[in-house]
Design a protein with these regions (language model features):
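Loop-helix junctions at membrane interfaces
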Residues: 1-198
């Protein structure tokens, strides 16, 4: 009976965190040092909380739920949502797996930072080979025009790969680190609620 109650709590918590993450996806804002089409949100925060509280699978499910909710209103033909899911799943999957094996503050920090690093590194080839070529086709936007948006900020970058390495790689890592920092601020107060403790 207790095991059944625990499973229900995990499923309910995962679903609720997925809904919160979906709302946070809409609360995005531009960053002055990035091209206007690159925006910051903290929608991985609930997924990271789920990954720490319930395990990596729950965190990945939160990433899936938020993107499925966002899908009907997408303007990217699901390319952006698929990218968001893959990156988020890598981030919270790595973080949750490491924390599951080492449930200490150090384990959480190492897991979150390593997850952010993996997400940032993988984002470069994913953007280079899939996302940006898809956007070029979908929006009939020349690749040179996209590169020009980066060069308007830093004229020294030449080529898409350089743009991704100089701008997107550190941005994605910092985004993950920000989610991690926020998680460490709110996780302890939320933990009793997530685990059904008073």
């Amino acid at each position: 009976m207790q095991n059944s109650t625990s499973k229900v709590r995990v499923l309910t918590g995962t679903a609720m965190l997925g809904a919160v993450a979906a709302v946070l996806m809409y609360l995005e804002f531009p960053i002055p040092i990035m091209p206007a089409f690159v925006k910051l949100d903290v929608s991985e925060l609930p997924a990271l909380i789920a990954g720490f509280a319930y395990g990596p699978v729950s965190g990945i499910l939160v990433c899936l739920i938020k993107n499925l909710i966002k899908l009907p209103s997408t303007s990217t033909a699901a390319v952006g949502e698929l990218f968001n899911f893959v990156m988020g799943a890598l981030f919270v999957g790595v973080a949750g797996l490491i924390y599951k094996r080492n449930k200490t503050r150090k384990g959480a920090i190492v897991g979150a930072l390593l997850g952010a690093l993996v997400m940032a590194v993988v984002s470069v080839p994913y953007n280079y080979f899939i996302v940006y070529p898809a956007y070029v086709v979908m929006y009939h936007l020349p690749l040179d025009a996209i590169i020009g948006m980066y060069q308007a900020i830093n004229p020294n970058v030449n080529g898409l790969l350089a743009c991704l390495l100089v701008f997107n790689l550190p941005f994605t890592f910092v985004k993950g680190a920000l989610d991690a920092a926020l998680c460490f601020l709110v996780y302890k107060p939320l933990s009793p609620i997530l685990h059904g403790r008073k």
